Amino acid sequence: MEDWSARQYLKFEDERTRPSRDLLARVPLDAPGLIVDLGCGPGNSTALLAERFPQAEIAGVDSSPDMLRRARERLPECKFVTADIGAWSPQPETELLFANAVMQWLPEHPAVLRRLLAALPQGGVLAVQMADNTSDPALALQREVAAEGPWANNPEVRGAARDDLLPPEFYYDLLKPLCARLDVWHIVYNHVLAGPEAIVEWFKGSSLQPYLRPLDAGGREKFLAAYRDKIAAAYKQRFDGKVLLRFPRLFIVAVR
């Protein structure tokens, strides 16, 4: 499990794409020439950008070979590049940097956000969405399982938890000195999923991956079984058997 799985991620494509739509709706540009989709994944967010800005040159950047393979199949007219976003820099003429659900994975993301915004020309836009759910049960239970099982002394497993985001005020003070306009807001989604098992499947495509990668096949199954039991106890099934997955997300749109 050294790579992110596009197939697993896309099991919930509609739900995962919804924040991209909400972020894109707040981008105040009419006809940008060059757009870069940072952390483009399998191209679902890139497709939205291509639909809204059909005349633009659009590139996607990601570190996952499997995600990029799927993105290239989906959008052969776009350019996709393998790169570490933490070290990547935009071309001077880039007018929109679109980063949906990627920056939260970078512990140094505040410095990365500030550097990317500073690299944009006047009027350029940095649009960011980050998962802000580390205190919600689904992620708290991942940390519980990591601390309780036979893998508890494995430093890779114990260190797999994502850092909390900082308060909105922090991002405002960080970025406002560099831009003419800054908008920061939260949206809390309540995704209707088929049942507790669907929650496990959701996070197998994202935040469970760093916990599972260091384990062998048997360890992964045991980890998932323990997590599955905790999720079933924490998320009550509604009258129709479905569950609601609460998912808060932080949005930032900065105009240089």
List each model region and its residues.
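Conserved Class I S-adenosyl-L-methionine
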Residues: 42-44, 159-256
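Class I SAM-dependent methyltransferase Rossmann-like catalytic core
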Residues: 2-14
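Conserved catalytic/acceptor-binding region of the Class I
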Residues: 110, 117, 121-194
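Class I SAM-dependent methyltransferase SAM/SAH-binding core
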Residues: 34-90, 111
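Conserved alpha-helix/loop element of class I SAM-dependent methyltransferases that forms part
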Residues: 15-34, 48
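A short acidic, Gly/Pro-enriched loop at the edge of an enzyme's catalytic core
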Residues: 89-97
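Short catalytic micro-motifs in class I SAM-dependent methyltransferases
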Residues: 101-102
